[in-house]
Amino acid sequence: MQFARQILFVVLALSVSAVQQAQAAAEADKVAVTTMIDRYCNAWSEPDAARRQQLLDQVWAEDGTYTDPLSNVAGRSNLSALIGGFLQQYPGSRIVLASAVDLHHERVRFAWKWVLADGSTTMEGMDFGELASDGRLRKIVGFFGPGVPLP
C-alpha cells in the first residue's frame, strides 16, 4: 500500500510539473506573439519603405494574406505597398495596439487604434489572424469600428 501511494505521489508530481511547463510555454508563446504584433503595428506606422519591409520580413509570411473592408492583398511586398499608400494619404499617422493579444491554436485577435499625426484617434478596429508554421503571420482579417449591434 505504501509503495502504491509513493507511485501515485510521483505521478501527481510529474503531472503538476507538466502542466506548469505547458503553462510557462504558452505564456512565452503569448509574449513572443505580442512582440510580433507590436512589430506588425510598427510596420503600419513606418513611412520608410525599406524599414517597413524589414519589419514585415520579420513578422509576415511571404505568401500571407491581408483582408479588410477596403483591401485584399497577398504577399509581403503587396502588403508593404498597401501600407505605403495608406501612409502617403495620412502622413504621420500610426496604428497602435489597443488590447492584449489573444492567442490560441495558432490564431490571434487584437484591437488597434488608428492615431493621426495630431494624436487624435480616428478609427478603432479588431484584427483576427492565423500564424504560419514558422510563427509569422499568415493571414489577417481586419474589421473597422465596433461590432454591429443586433437589430
Residue ranges and their predicted role:
Residues 1-5:
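Positively charged n-region of N-terminal signal peptides that target proteins for export
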Residues 51-106:
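A solvent-exposed, acidic/Ser-Thr-rich amphipathic alpha-helical stretch
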Residues 124-151:
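Short beta-strand edge/turn micro-motifs at domain boundaries
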Residues 110-117:
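Short beta-strand segments that buttress and anchor functional surface loops
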Residues 30-59:
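Short acidic-aromatic low-complexity motifs
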Residues 95-96, 109, 121-127:
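Short, surface-exposed coil-to-beta transition loops
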Residues 22-26:
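Boundary at the C-terminal end of the N-terminal hydrophobic targeting segment
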Residues 7-17:
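Bacterial N-terminal signal peptides
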